[in-house]
Amino acid sequence: LAQLSGRTLGHLTRGRYTQVTLDTELNPTVRQDGAREIPVEALSHGARDAFYFALRAALAQELAAREPLPLLLDDPTAHFDEERRGSLVGHLEDLAKDLQVILLTHDRRILNQVREAHVLKIGTESSASDSTRKIQIRR
């Protein structure tokens, strides 16, 4: 789990953090090659989000070998720059080959980066008399 998440984290952080360590109580730390361990809480928001994505993706891949379960992600790119967002989309597309990926996001830029998606758009239309929910599905 640590090795697989470390590879993904290294890719998402452009090689800045390449190793993940989990102690006996599963407390995570990250490190650069040959550098000291850094608690995840000390990372920037973007690096922390990248770490948690890498860990969830690694766990989903390990579990998929036994029983594929959907991977549900809620706005994983909130603190990502465009390059890191593109890297994450690439990982999601790789994961989607073996398991169902459900991504909840308000970031419309992701739609321009994915090759294939089923989009469920939920919004609100208001009129003077009532408020109704509208749902659009796009392939």
Q: What annotation goes with each model-predicted range?
A:
Residues 1-139:
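Terminal ABC-like ATPase head and other globular end-domains that cap long coiled-coil arms
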